[in-house]
Amino acid sequence: LDVSAKTPKAVLEAVSSGSITLNAGFFPEEGKYNRTACTRCYVQFSYEEAKAHRWKCPECKGRIKLGVRERAYAMSSIPATPRPPYLKMIPLGEVIARVLGVSSPNTKKAKALYDAFIERFGNEITVLLHAPEAEMAEVSAGVSSAVSAMREGRVLLFPGGGGKYGSFAFP
């Protein structure tokens, strides 16, 4: 937000006047119920397919659960508010874990690399949005490459649905 002062009133004024300078968040596709899918075998369906199957999976006869994405589209009669394009980010810890091939950002190896990035650049947002690729590569070439792929929208997404989390991969 572009605010005149760091007060609640100034923040509300900035939001209502459309002074939004960055629209960023995480990949909604990683959610457990992002797409319409079977809750038993996780096969994904379009809304029309699920409706045609009467919300019963033709593969395993499990229940098909309406995804958040399809629900949002169904409810989207409100006109969109003008704002900058949505920048999808992945938490730095998850990027590091994926690059290192470890199961969690909470492993000693992942935490040590995370701490090295924070020590060098100050905070996670700076790393994810602003740190120069060459400087990041001095800490970790793999993480630098992955962050660049994220910034450029080259992340491969595997949407979640039916209670199974989505996932991502770097090219």
Which residues make up each language-model segment?
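Charged catalytic cores and adjacent phosphate/nucleic-acid-binding surfaces used
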Residues: 1-171
